[in-house]
Amino acid sequence: MSQPCPCGSADEYSLCCGRIVSGERVAPDPSHLMRSRYCAFVMKDADYLIKSWHPTCNAAAFRDDIIAGFANTRWLGLTIFEHTWSEAENTGYVSFIARFSEQGKTGAIIERSRFIKENGQWYYIDGTRPQLGRNDPCPCGSGKKFKKCCGQ
């Protein structure tokens, strides 16, 4: 039975991010890497998350923390609202909202992730989280205030 890709593309997982997570295909840009990393969180694939972090981040040292985070978190959806990259500079940025539920409470991660490309491979480096006031417009583009949208 086919399974829809958790990234929200409407494609089957095996034809979408599953090909990147399995290593069959390399992420062609930071947006695809971000989507595949989100899928790895959904599928609880610590190995792929560690592999897709830049080696200087030493993500393997946090394997136990990554796995522990899987226990109580259910991922509800990913919205990418901005992505830019420069092949010439081998850098890219993806701004997203990842919704989740943890111990009965919903939440959202809003981040601008930074990526670097080395030897034909994109890697996640780190991210920054914007400081949003409750009355600010929601960055997802809904037109609602943050407090009535992703900030709930």
From Swiss-Prot:
- Lineage, top-rank taxon, reads Bacteria
Task: List the NCBIfam families.
Answer: PRK01617.1, PRK01752.1
Query: Which HAMAP family does the protein's record reference?
Result: UPF0225 (MF_00612)
**Family note:** Belongs to the UPF0225 family.
Record-given protein name: UPF0225 protein YchJ
